[in-house]
A protein has these predicted regions:
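Catalytic NTP-binding/metal-coordinating core of nucleotidyl cyclase/transferase enzymes
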Residues: 99-177
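Hydrophobic alpha-helical membrane-association signature
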Residues: 135-139, 181, 236-239
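Catalytic core of nucleotidyl cyclases, primarily class III adenylyl/guanylyl cyclases
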Residues: 150-174, 194-233
Length: 298
């Protein structure tokens, strides 16, 4: 059997499995407009930057429109093929690596996103090692693809966690894109990955997501401009990780510095978290008061 015949057989089998996996409610319109397409929204060169900011604040300027339904269906197809044939994904950190090398020793404003699997230890105890590797790798790559689709950069994979960051000439758009990405990640888990896993009697995968905004420094460990490891360091990285650790399964938490920059219609979907000083010990670096965190209302 040649490669084309194998592919045709995979697609036919997949469609049968996909029909069974589609026993879920879809919310197709909820996220279609969350992120925006820059190519559709560029203003003519004679318009002032102030006009662009006003339009963006009113929700008129759009950078990228994501077809979330199509993405979820493609996710299902990739996960199914991975489980059956060990399909490999394309590299997704190269873009970030190239970008950071151009900005070594610079301080950059960015929204940082951490997404991590919940209870991965239990998964490792229930499944064969080779299946665990495929599932976790596929999960990480699907999260990375969501980051890329929202004009973000994939910084790195750490165990069963993925770290991304979002930048834009308008930090408000960067914040909106980051939050839209986080929301799509939850949908990908609920509607893309887990239905396929369930068809194999595998347990659901759950995630918790944390975001924060601020300054970070790009550092290079070594003198080789092309090969030495590059990374991002700064308080935003640390706080985003702490915020993520506080999130419940399938929950999105954002720091106040992100909340302040997202569109008012998106802000309405978040509520302030009330934690004791023993639960949350981190203060705002500007005010010295406990740093406020918000959760997305499901």
């Amino acid at each position: 059997m040649n490669d084309n015949e194998i592919t045709d057989e995979i697609d036919k089998d997949y469609e049968k499995l996909l029909d069974a996996a589609r026993g879920i409610d879809t919310k197709s319109d909820e996220l279609n407009n969350d992120s925006v397409d820059e190519s559709e929204s560029k203003k003519s060169t004679d318009e002032t930057s102030a006009s662009n900011v006003i339009d963006m604040m009113l929700g008129k300027q759009k950078e990228k429109t994501i077809n979330s339904e199509a993405m979820i269906q493609e996710t299902q197809k990739r996960i199914w093929k991975s489980l059956k044939h060990g399909i490999e994904y394309d590299a997704t950190v190269d873009r970030s690596d190239a970008f950071l090398r151009e900005h070594v020793n610079e301080k950059l404003h960015m929204v940082v996103l951490y997404v991590d699997l919940v209870g991965s230890t239990n998964i490792t105890l229930r499944l064969p090692t080779e299946k665990i590797a495929i599932i976790i790798s596929s999960f990480a790559q699907e999260m990375a693809l969501a980051i890329k689709q929202h004009n973000g950069y994939v910084l790195k994979f750490v165990g069963d966690a993925v770290i991304g960051y979002f930048m834009h000439t308008s930090v408000l758009l960067a914040a909106d894109n980051a939050v839209s990405c986080a929301k799509l990640m939850i949908r990908i888990m609920d509607e893309g990955i887990n239905p396929i896993l369930n068809n194999y009697d595998y347990p659901d995968l759950l995630v918790h997501i944390g975001l924060d905004y601020g300054d970070n420094m790009v550092v290079r460990y070594g003198s080789d401009h092309e090969k030495s490891h590059v990374d991002i360091l700064g308080p935003t990285m640390n706080i985003a990780a702490k915020i993520q650790s506080m999130a419940k399964p399938q929950q999105i938490l954002i720091g106040a510095h992100v909340y302040e920059k997202i569109h008012p219609t998106v802000q309405e979907k978040f509520k302030k978290e009330e934690w004791s000083q023993t639960e949350w010990k981190y203060n705002d670096r500007k005010t010295g008061k406990p740093y406020i965190v918000y959760s997305l209302n499901n």
